Amino acid sequence: THLGQEELEVFHYHRAITNTNWKLFVDNNSELYHEFLHVLNRRTAVAHKSYHERNWLLYQNSHNIIQQGVIHYDSYGLGERSEGALPGMQPNGMVVMLLFPDVMLNIRATVMRIDTMTPLAPGKTLVEWRGVGLKSDTPDVRAMRIQHHNEVWGPAGRNLPEDIAAVETQWETMVQGGSRYSLFAREEGLKPQDDANLRAFYQEWGRCLGRAPNDPFRHGNVDTDVSHSIKEITNV
């Protein structure tokens, strides 16, 4: 359980219209092997054994969560996040929750980020980011949360500009014909870089739209009953 019954409060908001397809930003927020893109993530997470000892938990309708892990901020010269943790979070903990179709909740111990994506056109996506703390925060605690938020996120943070560059480059290569397909073939026993959550997303996307994710422009009857192919769902 995370956050409990505490009231939340948004303290940061910014948005951007990105030159990419909506699904690519959803993919970026969902798959964890893209963490190799971020220097901060490589040093503080991927390089450590504990990062790889977590599992994805997959739920019906493609709502997913990655088990909480510990981030080693000292590996990047950043301070510990051991005080003022949000309810349900351990010191230096991190957890990511994905709500179908396009909402991500990312908690880094003391602060939460909420992403929402809105498709505007095939190559235009509105992305909105919110930094969230507790409504009960004292001024000192709120200042701490803002600092921790801006160390990694925010328009001038370390990660978001890299995410935007990645998804816009992906879209450009697709439009120009350099990359016709996206492959979601990793099977790692539901470990962090398993593609099971992405496969679940596209199975649910296909069910909702009545289209086969691997051939969306096919005419005629399309089998959108994916219950026979989802073998990785967590029973709840």
Give a label for each model feature:
Residues 1-236:
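C-terminal catalytic domain of Rieske-type non-heme iron oxygenases
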